[in-house]
């Protein structure tokens, strides 16, 4: 099955004709969502249970692991890594029990390069989340160089990591290629960030906002469709996440891809209009 959705559920005003959208409303259009709240702070079990009440049985969540896991931030105050991992796992257990967790996502920064030390760290990540499906996103193209590419893929397969299939700006020397490399046949993840060459490497207070300021055109969506179809030929489940939402374009692009692929999702939430 191919599930197409977006990052977050609350920032897609085009779905509801107002600034923010609710999870219940989002789940009337898309069957999967990526949540990054767990990247910034540890989720609370009560919030996880609340999310589950707002989505149908066939809806799936992708949860970003905490920033401390991917070397991009500090541990929660007063916690060791072991304590933080335990708290995280306890909080998401209701989602696991309900069968709604698609996978955990570990997105590493571009300074996380292909070195022996990085591979050793990924070994630790696998140990920390041994019982969970884990997708790994690599942002530096050193992992994709000819001398490392095959061994990198073999390593991902051995660890049962799903290497995230990424679309990002094409004109920068450090970005990774869009290649449908499936390293875990059970599930795959595609993340589409847009192709804003200038914004991708911008710095300053508006850097995050500009990084994903992009709207895919029809030709580019056709390229993404081909990548998704090639991925689906080698994976039982595929989750496609549009992250190009700085300008509110993710939901529109996601819906356009659903239409282009002629996917008709069943058992979504009823839309608000259908309730009256």
Task: State the predicted function of each range.
Residues 1-276:
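Residues lining hydrophobic/aromatic ligand-binding pockets adjacent to catalytic sites
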């Amino acid at each position: 099955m191919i599930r197409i959705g977006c990052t977050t559920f609350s920032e897609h005003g085009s779905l509801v004709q107002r600034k923010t959208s609710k999870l219940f409303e989002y789940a009337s259009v898309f069957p999967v969502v990526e949540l990054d709240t767990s990247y910034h702070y540890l989720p609370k079990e009560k919030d996880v249970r609340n999310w589950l009440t707002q989505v149908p049985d066939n809806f799936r969540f992708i949860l970003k692991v905490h920033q401390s896991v991917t070397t991009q931030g500090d541990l929660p105050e007063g916690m060791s890594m072991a304590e933080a991992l335990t708290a995280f796992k306890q909080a998401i257990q209701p989602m696991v029990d309900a069968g709604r967790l698609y996978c955990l996502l570990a997105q590493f920064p571009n300074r996380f390069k292909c070195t022996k030390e990085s591979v050793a760290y990924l070994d630790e990540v696998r140990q920390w989340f041994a019982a969970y499906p884990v997708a790994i996103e690599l942002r530096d193209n050193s992992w994709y160089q000819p001398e490392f590419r095959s061994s990198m893929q073999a390593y991902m397969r051995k660890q049962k990591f799903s290497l995230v299939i990424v679309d990002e700006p094409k004109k920068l020397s450090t970005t990774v290629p869009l290649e449908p490399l499936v390293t875990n046949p059970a599930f795959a993840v595609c993340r589409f960030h847009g192709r804003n060459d200038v914004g991708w490497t911008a710095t300053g207070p508006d850097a995050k906002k500009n990084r994903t300021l992009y709207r895919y055109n029809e030709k580019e969506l056709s390229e993404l469709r081909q990548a998704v179809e090639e991925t689906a030929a080698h994976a039982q489940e595929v989750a496609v996440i549009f992250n190009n939402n700085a300008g509110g374009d993710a939901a529109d692009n996601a819906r356009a891809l659903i239409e282009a692929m002629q996917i008709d999702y069943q058992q979504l939430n009823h839309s608000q209009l259908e309730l009256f």
